[in-house]
Amino acid sequence: MRRADGRTDEERERHATIGFRTAGPLLAGLVAFALAGALLGWAVMYGVMFLKLMIVDMPSYQCGGSDCPRGMMPASLLAAVFGGGFFVLARLGAHSSGKLLPVGGACGAFLCGALAGLWPGWLALAWLVGPHMDVAWEVGPDRPSSARVLGYWESGPATVVRVRTDGLYAYNTAQGDARWSASAPDRARVCALSRTARSGTGLVGLERQGAPCGSSVAAVDLESGRFLWQRDNALAENATGYDITGVASTHATAVVVEKLGTLVGLGLRDGSERWRVDAPPDCGVSALGASGDRVLAVLECSGESSTGETAWLWAVDATSGSSDWRSPLPTSGPVSAAHILSADPIVVYAAGQDPWGTSGVTVFDADGSRRTVIPIAGPDEDLAFTAFTEGPGPQSMPAFQAVVSGELFISVVNDTKSDRPRGVSAYALADGRRVWHTTFDDGIDMLAPGRDGELTVVTSRWFDQLWRLDARSGTREQKAVVLDGVSLSPLFAVRPTANGGYLFVNLHEDSDEAALFAVD
């Protein structure tokens, strides 16, 4: 029986069966070609990332295991798997659809699959290699080549001042633009600087021909770069360029050292003398620090006392110059190095020359009583928190890889004989016990304060990485950020910026790297 369209029921059923038999292979071919397109896109994407990690992030072209740039080995394996999957699915699509699918349809399905797979493929790749930061701006290397960097100050949230032997240079931390520069006075060079800049004022020690470092002291306004005052400073006859003048400041008082043993308090903004106080006989000042209304000085005494102590911590009132207290440092002999790591709370590092002396970090109460001593060489690990520039000439500001946060002293530590420490530990200021410890796979280049309650740790092996740690627990806040395209000198400082990035200041004296740069 024929229907209105002229076909019988048998003919209609036969045509329907043919349609179903054709649609199945056609749909399978379209899906196979679309998946093949996605896999080819992923293979190219992961292959390019593998080449980038191998060529750019691994200059020696060889690595093994955890030494390899993060994500490199998985990227290479996945690129091969995706490439193989592409060939399998492309052949499957051609076999399934046969001649039913025109070339244009196959190409369209292939292209749609490739485009649809780009975004999820990129998200997976980004997770695999982890977060990255790129250089937002940089300031070129120091010129002239004779200039040597000594240290830096922060002036508010938007200005960093880099101190060199030939002068001071201020930069806007948002774009890296130069704000001002101040050349060293005629026939003089800068040779020392205060570790902190109070009330927008920095102190520098000057060296003139035939006179040692610290023969003059000057104050600089960090908003304008103007020298506020300059003062000749009397030094001992045997002073050398390594007897760095102590320069420190509270909010209203500048403190300098005369003749290696006399503290002089000056008006921070006008340089007028307000007080002076002599150290005990046969004692000289080897380190200076200040905070609030107190000045702290490390004394080294040549005449051995009745109790055998030769090194002391001396506290002086910053307003009147009166001596508050004097407490012995546990070195039991000559001191090879001493630094005031924190003036509030009081944390002092002192290393003894004699093997029977104690080298460690000493914590004092506000009244000068010794609270605890954290040994440099402990039963489980060694503190490894100082980094100095090398070579002759004036001494640069040491970069301390240690942070005092709340009631914790946090330091880079080394529990092996390797030259590259890989651990960070926190010790309680109350009793010196270790509160937490964390270990990294790569060597640690810098530990510094981060954002509120955080620490910043920079590590490197094949590439540079930045980590964020919770200062209270040592917990890592996130996966490490890979620093792309950065040029770090052997000695540098790092601090967070307001826009969520980080500012790096290179401080090595013989460096061709950028003077400073920001990443975001």
Give residue ranges: language-model regions.
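Short loop/turn segments that connect beta-strands within beta-propeller blades
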Residues: 173-175, 221-224, 267-271, 317-320, ...
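Acidic, serine/threonine- and glycine-rich low-complexity intrinsically disordered segments
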Residues: 264, 275-428, 437
